[in-house]
A protein has these predicted regions:
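A short, Lys/Arg-rich alpha-helix, primarily the initiator
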Residues: 1-18, 25
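DNA major-groove recognition helix of helix-turn-helix
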Residues: 12, 36-38, 65
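Helix-turn-helix DNA-binding elements, focusing on the entry/boundary residues of the two helices
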Residues: 19, 30, 44-47
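Recognition helix of helix-turn-helix/homeodomain-like DNA-binding domains
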Residues: 28-42
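Short, basic-rich loop-to-helix N-cap that marks the start of a DNA-contacting helix
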Residues: 39-52
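Short C-terminal boundary/hinge segments that cap the last helix of small helical domains
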Residues: 55-66
């Protein structure tokens, strides 16, 4: 599913988190989280982990596909 990488990065900035810190909250690797943000795609499971780590609803970080 498509994710809004810009929104995620803005949320990270607001929370003073870098990719490594976000990855730690998600119990994932920094490289994997970085790759997800670069690609702009993630599985539903990863979207849920990102949302939980950023304390937002998953719908706030996904892009609706056309």
């Amino acid at each position: 599913m498509k994710i809004n990488s810009v929104k995620i990065k803005m949320l990270m900035l607001e929370r003073d988190l870098n990719i490594g810190e976000l990855a730690k909250l998600m119990k994932s690797s920094r490289q994997w989280v970085g790759a997800i943000l670069d690609r702009g795609h993630a599985t539903l499971n990863m979207v849920n982990k990102i949302a939980k780590a950023l304390e937002v609803e998953p719908k706030e970080i996904i892009k609706l596909e056309d």
